Amino acid sequence: WFGTVMRGDIEPIRVGARSNIQENCVLHTDSGFPLTIGENCTIGHSAIIHGCTIGDNTLVGMGATVLNGAKIGKNCLIGANALITEGKEIPDNSLVVGAPGKVIRTLDDAAIAALTASAHRYVENAKRFASGLVEVHRPADFDPA
């Protein structure tokens, strides 16, 4: 989405199909720490995702930070403003909150379905935005001063 920074200058960044990276996120890598985001993932506004692996169908909440070498499993929900520290491994189907992030429970089928629905809504938004794009022209006498 608009305003996201993805710096793959040191290691590669891979984002899976139907995943969305929302406004003001920063995705970056370090030497030896590529960044992989699985399919059907939602990365919330202003999250910082750094040299880690995020499994399929996972939602990382707004303002969360995931650091080098962290591995988040499939079908996880990382709460807003959570901090996933370097090298931390989060099991599949986990709800994680806090700084540092702690698993507080296992997600049930309804919660996992909601993660999938979130990613699908953003796919539909992308289609809607793309179909409504129009070229904007400045008037010849435009003066930004």
Question: Which residues are covered by each model-predicted region?
Answer:
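Glycine-rich hexapeptide-repeat left-handed beta-helix
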Residues: D9, V15-A17, E23-C25, T29-D30, ...
